Amino acid sequence: FKFTYFVDKKSPVTKLSFPMAYDCSFEGTLDGDNYRFVLGVKVPVTTLCPCSKEISEYSAHNQRAIVKLKVNYDRQKYSIWPEDMIELVESCSSSPLYGILKRSDEKFVTEAAYENPKFVEDILRDIVVKLRKDKRINQFETEIEAFESIHNHNAWAYQSEGVKNNETTF
């Protein structure tokens, strides 16, 4: 089941509230007594190139990226909301995206990204570390694609793991 999930999000400086839309999904299967539930989210974020920052005197190139995350967890024991996974992903990026930004917000976002440069591999690694530590999650799959602003290709990274209960495939 796919749906658009709206989260009321405030801009970082002016605190203007605006709904952000996230593509989400629920997948459920029942095989005998084995019930499996998967929550999926697609989270847009900003990445800022560490290499570009290191070699440039004035700036660095950045791009919008989409992180796709699916988590399998026991709904009988735990609750995980789309917001939980959205916040996890955004905390691992160079900067979150916002629905509305005034100039002071734009300054904050671009400077925050500049102070937190990350390749897609860095973002993926940070997400994986947090997911491995989350006792609620049995299994996960995460993928990130950055829509490169100065290259003729996109950057991409992927990882899937069964963390608990001997899960090995997604």
List the predicted regions and their residue ranges.
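N-terminal intrinsically disordered, cationic/polar leader segments
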Residues: 1-170
